[in-house]
């Protein structure tokens, strides 16, 4: 196509700048033969209407270690690594016998964990940057401030409902476990000991559940707020087998990470539900695949959905 011709988007029919690789209105990727443009490095394209896509040239849009949702775990792991090292140095200074070496082993364990976590974090960020600036994305959009606030509120509400359901099951579960353990321990003295043992075990399990549930709820809410802590609307970038969403990157591969389902859930809010699997210990194991689809992007997402589903396990 000549450089002075403005491409017409095949999905929304809007006219775009000749340098665009993606539609400024709906985020659809154009034919790769068009002149290329690094969306995240280029000058901002001013949209004539609020609902149109604006490709920001702000460097904060690019993935980095410090804006990754899990960056906040680094200081915690660092502190857990330094503390046993300090104990080891203190123990050696006072000529303690055995426990300094136990502290040294704990230090090495946390150091190994910290290095693995940093390696995974760096790898995820590097892959995300390469993906965003490549020709692979099929569709991308950035939430408006109102859409981002709506998404945050929906995620917080959904998380609170999930924790309420879990809390309703957790206390009876621990009470049941306590009853069973109390019965087993009390049965050593026969039936006479089993009955009070069961009662004491049930009470202990109930109290333990009541204590544990608020702690677990607080940790869950803290994690969820960390994932959605930024006030800046985030990018969604999608390609077959690859997703960049909320500053996290997921790629289906043959090693362990895989896509298990991609569906469009239409209701009061429309969600793109992406089911992923990753081995335990992987940084992608906690990837959030619930993506709010703005109304302005719905037709485009429906158009590319079959291509996004190509890498679902068992369907490729």
Curated annotation (Swiss-Prot):
Any single GO CC term annotated in Swiss-Prot or TrEMBL for this entry: plasma membrane
Localization per record: Cell membrane
Residue intervals passing through the bilayer: 74-94, 99-119, 166-186, 188-208
Keywords, in A-Z order: Cell membrane, Membrane, Transmembrane, Transmembrane helix
Ranges in coiled-coil conformation: none
Keyword Cell membrane listed: yes
Membrane topology value: Multi-pass membrane protein
Alphabetized InterPro entries for the sequence: Tre1-like_N
Entry protein name: Uncharacterized protein slr0273
Organism: Synechocystis sp. (strain ATCC 27184 / PCC 6803 / Kazusa)
């Amino acid at each position: 196509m000549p450089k002075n011709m403005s491409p017409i988007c095949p999905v929304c029919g809007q006219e775009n700048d000749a340098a665009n690789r993606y539609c400024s209105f709906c985020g659809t990727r154009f034919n790769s033969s068009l002149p290329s443009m690094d969306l995240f490095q280029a000058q901002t394209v001013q949209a004539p209407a609020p609902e149109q896509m604006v490709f920001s040239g702000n460097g904060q849009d690019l993935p980095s270690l410090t804006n990754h949702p899990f960056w906040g775990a680094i200081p915690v792991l660092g502190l857990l690594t330094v503390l046993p090292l300090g104990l080891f140095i203190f123990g050696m200074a006072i000529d303690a016998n055995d426990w300094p070496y136990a502290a040294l082993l704990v230090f090495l364990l946390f150091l190994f964990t910290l290095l693995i976590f940093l390696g995974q974090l760096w790898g995820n960020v590097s892959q995300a940057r390469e993906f965003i600036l490549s020709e692979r994305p099929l569709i991308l959009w950035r939430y408006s401030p109102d859409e981002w606030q709506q998404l945050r509120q929906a995620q917080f509400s959904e998380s609170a409902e999930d924790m309420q359901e879990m809390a309703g099951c957790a206390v009876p579960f621990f009470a049941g476990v306590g009853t069973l353990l109390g019965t087993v321990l009390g049965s050593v003295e026969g039936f006479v000991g089993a009955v009070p043992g069961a009662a004491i075990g049930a009470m202990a399990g109930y109290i333990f559940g009541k204590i544990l549930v608020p702690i677990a709820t607080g940790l869950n809410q803290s994690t969820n707020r960390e994932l959605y802590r930024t006030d800046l609307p985030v990018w969604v970038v999608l390609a077959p087998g690859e997703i960049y969403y909320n500053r996290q990157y997921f790629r289906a591969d043959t090693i362990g990470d895989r896509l298990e389902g991609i569906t469009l859930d239409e209701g009061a809010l429309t969600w793109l539900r992406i089911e992923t699997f990753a081995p335990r210990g992987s940084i992608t194991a906690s990837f959030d695949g619930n993506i709010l689809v703005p109304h302005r992007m719905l037709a485009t997402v429906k158009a590319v959905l079959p291509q996004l589903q190509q890498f679902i396990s068992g369907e490729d």
